[in-house]
């Protein structure tokens, strides 16, 4: 049978493995109370008071107990999904959870109860107006947050901080659209009417607010995605030592033997709440060793995908001919920072040198062995990422949000151009406003394709 958004669904809502508590969640969809009450009777042997915790046995089809725990019944619309929902909180062993799940499926076979798909409970919450799309995505972002700052920002998005900003923009665009489109109906008055209502001034304020929202969203995207930083360079220049220094732990083997690192070593660290995904790679050189050559090929693949490349050099030799060959292969669109390591052997103080001319690279002089200059390097990485100190109060945002905000920004810029031409382009002015509104509505899901919804919710865990 084809799954639909109105089917009754069930899933284990807690993570796999053993724990003190495990939760099985049922959302009854079109079955409503007519399905919920018989299932509650079958599993719990008694009626449950709505929104009250009841300590009951969970029984099989013969009345024998499978477990004892807390049962919670939430009649619609006062539930997570907006439908009638039952939650069974039992002991968190995988066998117990599977027994409860199968018992629900068996008892609910008569009204079409099926296993939930990934993210289907949250999808129901979105479809039933319990959450908008940005808030629904924040549920997954909160679960997946890799830093405290990311978790707090996801919580703000879930609370509606991002959505409120978008809704305010949409309301302002709608108000301006109404003004412009009403003016189109009275062409003999269009110039005086628009000027009297200060249409261009209103548009300028909308664009200013959108730029502010986009700036905050960029900061939120950094909190969510972080920065991929690849350590690259010749063998034995201290890449593994730098990874260990940045991470504050001995993660990579460090020896004076060239070619010790043959495959990547990755570690995520936090700097001001931003996850930095540091990747130590095989030293770049010509070699006949087949295993090392595979590692070097993987290094170049990582460099192609990097957000930032740290090109490590030995400060005793500086930029050699071999280093020039390596630098020439770096992809043009990836920022590169030249890191001169081993200043403990040269006596050069740790420092950051920003480029004096276009085309030059930032240079960081440091000692990974002693830790000199490591904080300077962290600060430089945050600067490249565009992180603003104190921005941890922003909401979390995704790449699709940034794309929509930039598209709306472009449409509003086009609208401003048409507004300057007055009557000759008034219909185009109105159309650009409509397109900007459409992009903003896509963020909260008021205008969203079914295909996009499928992609978003398929990335959730089952049971959420």
Swiss-Prot record:
Function: Exhibits a very high intrinsic GTPase hydrolysis rate. Involved in the addition of a carboxymethylaminomethyl (cmnm) group at the wobble position (U34) of certain tRNAs, forming tRNA-cmnm(5)s(2)U34.
Residues that bind GTP: 236-241, 255-261, 280-283
Binding site for K(+): 236, 255, 257, 260
Compartments where located: Cytoplasm
Native species: Burkholderia ambifaria (strain ATCC BAA-244 / DSM 16087 / CCUG 44356 / LMG 19182 / AMMD) (Burkholderia cepacia (strain AMMD))
Cofactor binding annotation: Binds 1 potassium ion per subunit.
Protein name, UniProt field: tRNA modification GTPase MnmE
PROSITE patterns: G_TRME
Keyword Repeat listed: no
Molecular function GO labels: GTP binding; GTPase activity; metal ion binding
Positions contributing to Mg(2+) binding: 240, 261
């Amino acid at each position: 049978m084809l799954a639909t958004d109105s089917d009754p669904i069930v899933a284990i809502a807690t993570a796999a493995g053993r724990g003190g508590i495990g939760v099985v969640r049922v959302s009854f969809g079109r079955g409503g109370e007519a399905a919920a009450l018989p299932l509650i009777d079958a599993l719990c042997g008694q009626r449950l008071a709505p929104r009250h915790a009841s300590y009951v046995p969970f029984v099989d089809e013969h009345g024998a107990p499978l477990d004892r725990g807390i049962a919670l019944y939430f009649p619609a619309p006062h539930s997570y999904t907006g439908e009638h929902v039952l939650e069974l909180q039992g002991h968190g062993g995988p066998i117990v959870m599977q027994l409860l799940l199968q018992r629900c499926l068996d008892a609910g076979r008569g009204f079409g109860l099926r296993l939930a798909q990934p993210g289907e409970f949250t999808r129901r919450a979105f479809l039933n107006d319990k959450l908008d799309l940005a808030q629904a995505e924040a549920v997954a972002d909160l679960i997946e947050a890799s830093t405290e700052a990311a978790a707090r920002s996801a919580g703000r998005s879930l609370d509606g901080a991002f959505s409120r900003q978008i809704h305010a923009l949409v309301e302002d665009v709608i108000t301006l659209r109404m003004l412009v489109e009403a003016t189109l109906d009275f062409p003999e008055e269009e110039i005086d009417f628009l000027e009297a209502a200060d249409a261009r001034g209103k548009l300028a304020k909308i664009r200013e607010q959108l730029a502010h929202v986009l700036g905050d969203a960029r900061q939120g995207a950094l909190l969510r995605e972080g920065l991929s930083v690849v350590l690259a360079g010749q063998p034995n220049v201290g890449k593994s030592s730098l990874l260990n220094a940045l991470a504050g732990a001995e993660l990579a083997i460090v020896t004076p033997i060239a070619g010790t690192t043959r495959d990547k070593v990755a570690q995520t660290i936090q700097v001001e709440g931003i996850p930095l995904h540091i990747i130590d790679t095989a030293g770049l050189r010509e070699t006949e060793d087949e295993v090392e050559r595979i590692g070097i090929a993987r290094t170049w693949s990582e460099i192609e995908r990097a957000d930032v490349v740290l090109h490590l050099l030995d400060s005793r030799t500086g930029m050699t001919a071999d280093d020039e060959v390596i630098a020439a292969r770096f992809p043009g669109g990836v920022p590169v920072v030249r890191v001169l390591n081993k200043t403990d052997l040269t006596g050069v103080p740790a420092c950051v040198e920003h480029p004096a001319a276009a085309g030059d690279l930032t240079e960081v002089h440091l000692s990974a062995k002693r830790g000199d200059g490591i904080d300077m390097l962290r600060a430089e990485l945050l600067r490249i990422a565009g992180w603003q100190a104190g921005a941890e109060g922003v909401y979390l945002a995704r790449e699709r949000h940034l794309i929509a905000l930039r598209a709306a920004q472009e449409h509003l810029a086009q609208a401003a151009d048409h507004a300057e031409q007055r009557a000759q382009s008034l219909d185009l002015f109105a159309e650009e406003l409509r397109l900007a509104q459409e992009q903003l509505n896509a963020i909260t899901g008021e205008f969203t394709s079914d295909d996009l919804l499928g992609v978003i919710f398929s990335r959730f865990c089952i049971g959420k």
